[in-house]
C-alpha cells in the first residue's frame, strides 16, 4: 500500500492555478466549504495527480488559530484520499462564518464535511 503523504507536488502554488480551479466546476457545497475542480495541469515532467488548494479568508475565520486548524483538517482529509481521487486540481473555499464553537467541535464538523465532499468526487 502506498504511503499517504502530501508532497509539494500535491498542492497548488501559483495564483493562476487557484484561479483556474475556482473557475472550474463546482463539485460540492456544504455548510462551510465549496469544493471546485478543474483538469490538472501539472508542470512538465510530472504525471497528472490530484492537487489541493485552500482559500480560508480572514473575513470568515477571524482568528489565526481557527484558520490554521481548518487548513490542517483539510490537508489531513486530502492526504488520506489523494490517491483515490481523479487527477484534477481541487480548491476548497470557506464560504461562510462558522458559528461560535470550541475548536475541537469545529474541527470535527469541518472534517465530516470535507470527507463528504471528497467522497462525492471519488469514482
Curated annotation (Swiss-Prot):
Pfam families: Ribonuclease_P. Belongs to the RnpA family. The gene is rnpA. Consists of a catalytic RNA component (M1 or rnpB) and a protein subunit. RNaseP catalyzes the removal of the 5'-leader sequence from pre-tRNA to produce the mature 5'-terminus. It can also cleave other RNA substrates such as 4.5S RNA. The protein component plays an auxiliary but essential role in vivo by binding to the 5'-leader sequence and broadening the substrate specificity of the ribozyme. Keywords: Endonuclease, Hydrolase, Nuclease, RNA-binding, tRNA processing. This is Ribonuclease P protein component. GO terms for molecular function: 3'-tRNA processing endoribonuclease activity; ribonuclease P activity; tRNA binding. It is an enzyme of class 3 (hydrolase). Gene3D superfamilies: 3.30.230.10. Its EC number is 3.1.26.5. One of its GO terms (cellular component) is ribonuclease P complex. GO terms for biological process: tRNA 5'-leader removal. Signal peptide: none annotated. InterPro entries: Ribosomal_Su5_D2-typ_SF, Ribsml_uS5_D2-typ_fold_subgr, RNase_P, RNase_P_CS. It catalyses: Endonucleolytic cleavage of RNA, removing 5'-extranucleotides from tRNA precursor.
Amino acid at each position: 500500500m502506498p504511503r499517504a503523504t502530501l508532497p509539494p507536488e500535491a498542492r497548488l502554488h501559483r495564483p493562476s492555478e487557484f484561479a483556474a480551479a475556482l473557475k472550474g466546476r463546482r463539485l460540492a457545497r456544504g455548510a462551510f466549504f465549496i469544493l471546485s475542480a478543474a483538469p490538472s495541469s501539472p508542470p512538465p515532467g510530472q504525471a497528472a495527480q490530484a492537487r489541493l488548494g485552500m482559500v480560508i479568508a480572514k473575513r470568515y475565520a477571524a482568528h489565526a488559530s481557527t484558520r490554521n486548524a481548518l487548513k490542517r483538517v483539510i490537508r489531513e482529509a486530502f492526504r488520506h484520499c489523494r490517491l483515490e481521487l481523479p487527477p484534477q486540481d481541487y480548491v476548497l473555499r470557506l464560504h461562510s462564518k462558522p458559528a461560535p464553537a470550541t475548536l475541537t467541535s469545529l474541527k470535527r464538523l469541518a472534517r465530516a464535511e470535507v470527507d463528504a465532499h471528497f467522497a462525492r468526487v471519488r469514482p
